[in-house]
Structures are given as structure tokens and as C-alpha cells.
Amino acid sequence: MEALSKPKGKFGQSLQVRLVSDLEKSQRYYRDVLGCKVDNWGHAERDGMTIILQQASSQEDVRPNALSKKRQDYPTDWEGPKFGWDTYIHVSWDDFDLLVEEIRGNGGFIAVEPYTDTHGIWEFKNTCIKDPDGYSIVLGSMREF
């Protein structure tokens, strides 16, 4: 007799929480540069991206991610990112250039200029922007060859 599997609950949307050094400055950045709707709670939302901005108690609490260790066991020849990622946002291939130019036009800091790479049967476009506290927001797109 086959054992009955137990029902499992479903996770909902996950949100990133970001400790920032100056809440008002960060709210302006996410609103004016990234085009987010920002509420008084500190939620910065645009399309499928939501980041919760919270005032850090001290500057030492603001800690963007460091570069991750390289790995040899990815399914393709990729070993990992070349810089620290705090947020990775998938965008469509067609929207990628539009978003980069919008952010650049709004005064956003493009820390890593857009580049294209390949892994197996996939072509990728990535860029990295930095917010006022140095958090890396990677915009990435992919398509099959």
C-alpha cells in the first residue's frame, strides 16, 4: 500500500529587507531613480520588485553583500558572479536596455556597465546599479540561442 503524501503549504512572495543609513534619502532614490512607488512603511515597489527599506540603528548595520566564493560545480562553465549581488532582478530581453537608459537618465549609478555573456545554450545580459548605501541591484536578462 502506497503511503499518502502530506499536503504542503505554499510560500507567498518573498520581499527583501534592506537596512539603510538614511531612510528618506533611500526612499527618494528608489522613487526618483528606480521609479518605484514608495509608501510610508518603506516599501519600494515596481512591477515584480519589492524591497522594504528600514532605517539602520547604526552605519555598521548597513552591509551590502561581499563577493561570493567561486564554485566549480555549476551546470555550465560559469563559476559565479564577478561582484557582490544584493538583489538580482530578472527583466525581459526587450526591457533590459530601456531600463538601463531610464535609470541612467534618472541619475542612477551604473557600477557595472551592461555586458553580454553565454552559458551553455543561454545568452545573458547583465548590469549592476548601486543604491546610495552601495547595495548592488543586478538587472539580468536571458534568452536561448
Language-model features: locations:
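A conserved hydrophobic helix/loop-capping motif in glycosyltransferases and polysaccharide synthases
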Residues: V17-L19
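Conserved active-site tyrosine of GNAT-family acetyltransferases
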Residues: S26-R31, I103, G134
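Vicinal oxygen chelate
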Residues: M1-L15, L34-S92, L98-K130, S141-F145
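Short, glycine-anchored, charge-dense loop/turn motifs used at functional sites
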Residues: D131-I137
